[in-house]
């Protein structure tokens, strides 16, 4: 019998500084990250949550699929956009976070 671990919550796209004036998009959100971690450990995981029906939402869906996470209950919301977080780094390596408002 195969046990599936269901991860419920947010999936966000983190925007990290790659070089001056350029941000790199990375998958984020603790529940989505946990689902990926379980799958990488050969576990059977699934993600339940909502993203926007937009390019960031499609990026999150494709990333989870590529990581072998079941996304059948991941909803693409046409009324709200995918959550995004801009991550900043100060001179000491401390992170700051700017969360976009009204996400999915």
Language model feature labels by segment:
Residues 1-22:
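Positively charged, low-complexity intrinsically disordered leader regions
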Residues 16, 35-36, 59, 100:
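Residue-level recognition of conserved structural "scaffold" positions that shape functional pockets
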Residues 20-26, 102:
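Short glycine-enriched, charge-decorated loop/helix-capping segments at active-site entrances
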Residues 30:
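Hydrophobic/small residue at the entry helix of a nucleotide-binding pocket
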Residues 33-44, 89:
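Alpha-helix C-terminal capping segments
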């Amino acid at each position: 019998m195969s046990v599936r671990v269901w991860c419920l919550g947010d999936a966000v796209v983190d925007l990290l500084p790659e070089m001056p004036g350029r941000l790199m998009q990375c998958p984020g959100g603790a529940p989505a990250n946990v689902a990926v971690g379980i799958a990488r450990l050969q576990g059977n995981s699934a993600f339940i949550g909502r993203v926007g029906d937009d390019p960031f939402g499609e990026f999150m869906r494709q990333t989870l699929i590529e990581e072998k996470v079941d996304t059948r209950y991941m909803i693409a919301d046409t009324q709200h956009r995918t959550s995004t977080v801009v991550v900043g780094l100060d001179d000491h390596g401390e992170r700051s976070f700017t969360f976009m408002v009204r996400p999915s």
